[in-house]
C-alpha cells in the first residue's frame, strides 16, 4: 500500500466521486479548461473517457510551496511530482480507480 497526498477540486469545481478506470495516460500533456491552459503537465492519468478528469503531477503547486491535502484544483486530482511519476509507471490502462471523499 502507498499513501499519496493529493489535492482535489475546490468547492466551486469539485472532483466527482465515482468508480472508474484508467482510460489514457500522457507523459506530458496540455490541460485546458474554460478558464485555464496549462502546457506540459507531467504524468497525467485520465480516469474519464472524455479526459475531463485526470490525476496528474502539479509541479506549480509544489514550486509555490502550497501543501497537498487541501482542495485546490479545477476538478482533477493533483499529485506531488515524485508520487505522480511512480503512479504513472505502475498503473496500466484499465486499472480500476475509485475516487472517494
Where would I find each of the regions flagged by the language model?
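Exported/periplasmic cell-wall-interacting domains
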Residues: 13-19, 24-101
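A structural motif detector for short, solvent-exposed N-terminal "entry" segments of globular domains
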Residues: 1-12
Amino acid at each position: 500500500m502507498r499513501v499519496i497526498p493529493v489535492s482535489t477540486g475546490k468547492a466551486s469545481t469539485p472532483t466527482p466521486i465515482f468508480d472508474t478506470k484508467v482510460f489514457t495516460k500522457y507523459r506530458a500533456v496540455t490541460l485546458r479548461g474554460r478558464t485555464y491552459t496549462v502546457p506540459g503537465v507531467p504524468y497525467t492519468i485520465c480516469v474519464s473517457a472524455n479526459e475531463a478528469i485526470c490525476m496528474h503531477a502539479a509541479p506549480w503547486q509544489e514550486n509555490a510551496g502550497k501543501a497537498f491535502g487541501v482542495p485546490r484544483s479545477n476538478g482533477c486530482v493533483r499529485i506531488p511530482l515524485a508520487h505522480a511519476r511512480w503512479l504513472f509507471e505502475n498503473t496500466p490502462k484499465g486499472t480500476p480507480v475509485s475516487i472517494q471523499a
